């Protein structure tokens, strides 16, 4: 296969969000003390699931995107064939199921439900008032996918569920910003489109701020790392960085708000 279709296939997988969720999984595995092998396995499972969601999104929207001439969509523009994308989806789904169940049935079932939420979004919920629900469910369940994996399965602290859900809602609202006009032209009327640009920014930033406030509380729930002065210094630096990124979320253009989030 020549490099051009490979690059187009990677682009069709929505590499930004896919990499973000996969990286978050790896960070959660480290923060919750999962063994290295378990962390690698659950991260690979999440990567496979996210690839299937990204590719299915481009494939399902191909006809609609082609109608308005979206050259940034590899399937719609013909940069990669639908047949190749279908094959990639099949392989990624098979890998997702195998890797998920290898993490243990509790983690596996939870992760497959998470992937199902992503597919439900692609298949229709993205055009409804409830478009943020799959994101809330998926991001909210992600910590459990990690902590339930391996030989010592356990549920995460309750605040992680809520933090993940808020992060998912914020990510959805901010990720949709650059595509609001194109989506509206194809009849998509999800929550960000109903709120508009400013409303999505404000609500998205608010959701992320709420998630951050809960994340700060992880330290008291036993997820803290460094303690004393170094721990407090790290917390202050993290809050300062979050403030700067928050301004990018509210004032930025293009993909910058999502990247900052």
Pin down the residues of each PLM region.
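Multi-pass alpha-helical membrane architecture of UbiA-family
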Residues: 1-261
């Amino acid at each position: 296969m020549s490099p051009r279709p490979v690059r187009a296939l990677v682009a069709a997988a929505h590499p930004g969000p896919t990499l973000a969720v996969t990286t978050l999984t790896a960070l959660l595995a480290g923060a919750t003390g999962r063994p290295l092998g378990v962390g690698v396995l659950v991260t690979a499972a999440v990567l496979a699931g996210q690839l299937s969601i990204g590719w299915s999104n481009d494939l399902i929207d191909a006809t609609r995107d082609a109608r308005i001439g979206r050259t940034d969509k590899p399937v719609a523009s013909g940069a990669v064939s639908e047949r190749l994308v279908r094959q990639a989806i099949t392989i990624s789904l098979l890998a997702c199921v195998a890797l998920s169940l290898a993490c243990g049935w509790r983690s596996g079932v939870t992760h497959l439900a998470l992937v199902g939420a992503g597919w439900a979004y692609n298949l229709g919920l993205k055009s409804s008032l409830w478009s943020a629900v799959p994101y809330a469910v998926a991001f909210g369940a992600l910590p459990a996918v990690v902590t339930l994996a391996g030989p010592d399965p356990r549920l995460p602290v309750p605040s992680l569920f809520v933090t993940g859900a808020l992060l998912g809602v914020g990510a959805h609202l901010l990720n949709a910003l650059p595509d609001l006009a194109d989506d509206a032209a194809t009849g998509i009327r999800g929550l960000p489109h109903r709120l508009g640009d400013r409303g999505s920014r404000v609500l998205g930033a608010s959701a992320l701020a709420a998630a951050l406030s809960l994340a700060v509380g992880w330290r008291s729930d036993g997820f803290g790392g460094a303690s004393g002065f170094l721990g407090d210094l790290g917390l202050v630096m993290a809050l300062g960085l979050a403030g700067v990124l928050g301004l990018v979320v509210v004032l930025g253009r293009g993909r910058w708000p999502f990247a900052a989030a």
